[in-house]
Every structure is written in C-alpha cells, then in structure tokens.
UniProtKB/Swiss-Prot annotation:
Domain notes: The LysM (lysin motif) domains are small globular domains involved in binding chitin in eukaryotes. ELP2 contains 2 LysM domains.
One Pfam entry name: LysM
Gene from which the chain derives: ELP2
Keyword Transferase in record: no
Stated name of the protein: Secreted LysM effector ELP2
Length: 176
C-alpha cells in the first residue's frame, strides 16, 4: 500500500506527532540548484540546521509586495508547502493582511507541484467575451484561469489599469 507524503503528514499532524525530517547534520538533496535552492549558513561556529522537523511553523502576516515566493525564501520553505498548509486554491493569490502558517526550514522545498502552467494562448476559443472581476482577482490570475497570456488580456483591455481592478468590474476577454 502506498501513501503520499501529504497523507503521512496529515496523519501525523492529526495525532500531534512531530516526525523528524532531517537533523542538523543532514543536507538537503536537490536535483537542480536553480529549482530548489538550499539554505546557506553564515559560516558561524554553530550553524543552524538546514532542515527542521514536521511541526516547525512560523505564523506570518502578508505585507504589501510579498508573494509566496518571497515568504518561502525568507523561511526556507516551499511555495507549495505553504499553499498546502494554508489550503490556498491558487498560490499566485494572497492578500495583504492574510495570516499564513509557514512550514520552516523544509529539507526539500516544494516550489512546483501546486503551480498551474501559465497559458500560452492569445485568445479563448468560443469563450465568453467578458469577465467580471471577483475579490482577489489579478490580471495574471484571470489570464491563467482562461489559459491565455497576461499580455493578451492586457491588450484586450486598453485603458484598464491592472493594479486598480475593482470587484464587479467587467473586462474584455480576447475571443478567437
């Protein structure tokens, strides 16, 4: 019988079990330094561990300009680790003032499994010609949900400032 790591982690969390993931002498194994940067130490005599244990979290409040990427880097976590822990539907959408529980010092940060591929199409085939903005929407998130590029959505909406979207605002969708 096989279980995913999330099943094991959820079971451990429900029983308040702290499973060691790595110890201070263990180094994270990565396949690509660019995809999974490993934490670095300052060269101090007693460097901090490169990995924490299950249950090591930091509560943080999202500030203006922060993304899951910047938060993950700050706490040596992964974008998808944070998204999973906080049950985020879209890791590209977080809000100023939102409180997140961040797993810290993760041995093998997951920065890819929860990401939806960015659309490459320039128009939606047979789709609706308009879209009504909802709370949390950004041009990036709307374009991603439609499977089109942000540039094509921006091009279909001259005069609309993407940073100033309002709830219930109607924008154009490029239709093929």
């Amino acid at each position: 019988m096989q279980f995913s790591i999330f099943t094991v982690l959820a079971a451990a969390a429900s029983f308040a079990v702290a499973l060691p993931v790595c110890d201070a002498t263990t180094t994270a194994t990565t396949t690509s330094a660019a995809a999974n940067p490993s934490p670095t130490t300052s060269g101090a005599a007693n460097p901090s561990p490169t990995c924490g244990k299950l249950g090591d979290f930091h509560k943080t409040t999202v500030k203006a300009g922060q993304t899951l990427t910047t938060i993950a880097e700050r706490f040596h976590s992964g974008i998808c680790d944070i998204a999973w822990q906080n049950k985020l539907e879209n890791p590209n959408v977080i809000f100023v003032g939102q409180v997140l529980l961040v797993p810290v010092n993760v041995c093998n940060p997951d920065n890819t499994s929860c990401l939806v591929p960015v659309g490459e199409a320039t128009c939606v085939t047979g789709g609706p010609a308009t879209y009504t903005i909802k709370s949390g929407d950004t041009f990036f998130a709307v374009a991603q949900s439609l499977g089109i590029t942000t540039d094509s959505l921006t091009g279909a909406n001259p005069g609309v400032v993407p940073e100033n979207l309002q709830i219930d605002q109607v924008i154009n969708v490029p239709v093929c």
